[in-house]
Amino acid sequence: MAKLHDYYKDEVVNKLMTEFNYNSVMQVPRVEKITLNMGVGEAIADKKLLDNAAADLAAISGQKPLITKARKSVAGFKIRQGYPIGCKVTLRGERMWEFFERLITIAVPRIRDFRGLSAKSFDGRGNYSMGVREQIIFPEIDYDKVDRVRGLDITITTTAKSDEEGRALLAAFDFPFRK
């Protein structure tokens, strides 16, 4: 079992119970899933780019990514409905906790010119989204084998009812918010 999951059960739940005066342990917000999304717009011209992006995402997450397709045709972007334009992975359970731990302890501190993550990236319902400009911050990616530096979106979905609860949940994990 991931250390962070044990830490959540032992420490974070008690801390949030006292902070927000919850009546039941089930009211305490928890991390539900983490979604990684990589949009590869250049895949229209070269299908190999999408395969490389999917391989990178598989290495980062430890799970085979789902290829996302265009929902509708857009002439300005030269895409048609059904064209493969990206890939995504939804992590839950044990893999989610392991990824979350690697994200906080290893990957985020390796971001170039890192001064902390914005605390304003909550969606109003306690979910947090962040963008990563380079996939090479993850130790699973071999820098020499990278054909192109790509970014990805990371969304942390929680059961929190408000941004305040979501921020308290992530802060309890020592999430590196900007001061």
UniProtKB/Swiss-Prot annotation:
Keyword Disulfide bond annotated: no
Question: What GO molecular-function term can you cite, just one?
Answer: tRNA binding
Gene3D superfamilies from the xrefs? Answer: 3.30.1440.10
One GO CC term, this protein? ribonucleoprotein complex
UniProt keywords, alphabetically = Ribonucleoprotein, Ribosomal protein, RNA-binding, rRNA-binding, tRNA-binding
Supply one GO BP term: translation
Q: Name one Pfam family in it.
A: Ribosomal_L5
**The UniProt record lists the keyword Acyltransferase:** no
Q: Which domain of life is it from?
A: Bacteria
User: PANTHER family under this entry?
Assistant: 60S RIBOSOMAL PROTEIN L11-RELATED
Per the similarity annotation, which family is this?
Belongs to the universal ribosomal protein uL5 family.
Kindly give the NCBIfam families that the UniProt entry links to this protein.
PRK00010.1 (NF000585)
Q: How does it assemble?
A: Part of the 50S ribosomal subunit; part of the 5S rRNA/L5/L18/L25 subcomplex. Contacts the 5S rRNA and the P site tRNA. Forms a bridge to the 30S subunit in the 70S ribosome.
**What protein name is recorded for this chain?**
Large ribosomal subunit protein uL5
